[in-house]
Structures are given as C-alpha cells and as structure tokens.
C-alpha cells in the first residue's frame, strides 16, 4: 500500500471517528434496560442518554426526563439524577474536545501532506480521549439508581468504536512514508 493511500485512509478513519463521536454525543442510548417492571406490562424499557432518560410505555417512547430539571428540584429522590447530569455534561465536554482535536488533525494533514508527528499525535489523542470519555461517563454515572440488568447502549458502543478508529488512524498515518 502506498504512502498516499495510507494517509487518505488515516484521514478517512479520523472522519469516521468524528462522525461516530457526533452521533454518539447526540444519541439517546448510552445505557439501555429492557423489561423495566415485570408486574406492569406497560413499561417496556428505558434509554439513558447523556442529558436525559427516556422510558418506553406501551411500546411508545415517552417524553424525556432531563437530568438538569430533575436535579433542580429539592426532592432527594432525584439526587442520583445530579450525578447523571454531571457525568453527561463532563462527557459532552470531552467529546467536544475530541471533535476539535480531530478537526485540527484533519486540517493539518490536508494542508501539510508531509508526514508530521503533530498530526499523528493529534489523531491518537482524539481516539484516546473518545475512549476516555466513555470511561469517565461510566464511572461518574450513578450505578445505584438503575437496575442490574442495564447494559451499554448503541451510542456508548459507537463512541468506543470511534476511539478505536482514532487510534488506528493515528497508527496508519504514522506508517505512511
């Protein structure tokens, strides 16, 4: 594989990384739970996003419960929502940094097609930060508020794949002569 093709492939990987990060950031399925309450046939599941939670009632996705609104109330029952809101806000900020770093890496690689260590470093940093964002969100997200059967949702997996693509793109760019 020639060096030019490797560079374009690396740029494509970073573009895919950024697309998945944006899709993951604005999606509503970072955590999912099917079969909320076995005693109530109307509740079918829930989806937790970075900034809100959705509950499926009678097969329809209900109105979102925004963490910031629930956190603003003085009711102690909503206190775990403050942790979820903080985790979502922190993760969103990290993902915006990933988008900025990845965009700068793409711009530098197109303006200066020569192999530079700065572009490789920026591409790798975008991938590592995308993975770190998922890890930060998972550790900050309140674990006691939701049931044990909750699993990572599609948007969390997309962000993980985005991080892997960012790291692989940096490696591919480094290998180009």
What are these regions, as identified by a protein language model?
Residues 26-86, 141-150:
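Long, glycine/tryptophan/cysteine-rich extracytoplasmic
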Residues 3-28, 88-138, 159-174:
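Signature of small four-pass
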Residues 49, 116, 153-154:
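Alpha-helix initiation/capping motif
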Residues 148-161:
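Individual transmembrane alpha-helices with interfacial aromatic-anchor signatures
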């Amino acid at each position: 594989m020639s060096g030019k093709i490797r560079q374009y492939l690396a740029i494509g990987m970073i573009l895919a990384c950024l697309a998945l990060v944006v899709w993951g950031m604005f999606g509503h399925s970072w955590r999912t739970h099917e079969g909320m309450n076995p005693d109530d046939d109307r509740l079918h599941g829930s989806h937790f996003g970075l900034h809100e939670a959705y509950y499926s009632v009678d097969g329809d996705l209900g109105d979102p419960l925004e963490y910031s609104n629930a956190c603003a109330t003085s009711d102690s029952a909503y206190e775990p929502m403050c942790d979820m809101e903080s985790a979502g806000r922190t993760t969103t900020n990290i993902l915006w940094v990933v988008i900025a770093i990845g965009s700068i890496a793409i711009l530098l690689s197109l303006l200066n097609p020569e192999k530079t260590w700065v572009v490789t470093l920026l591409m790798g940093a975008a991938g590592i930060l995308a993975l770190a964002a998922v890890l930060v969100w998972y550790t900050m997200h309140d674990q006691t508020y939701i049931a044990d059967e909750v699993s990572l949702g599609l948007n969390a997996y997309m962000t993980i794949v985005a991080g892997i693509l960012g790291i692989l793109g940096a490696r591919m760019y480094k290998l180009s002569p």
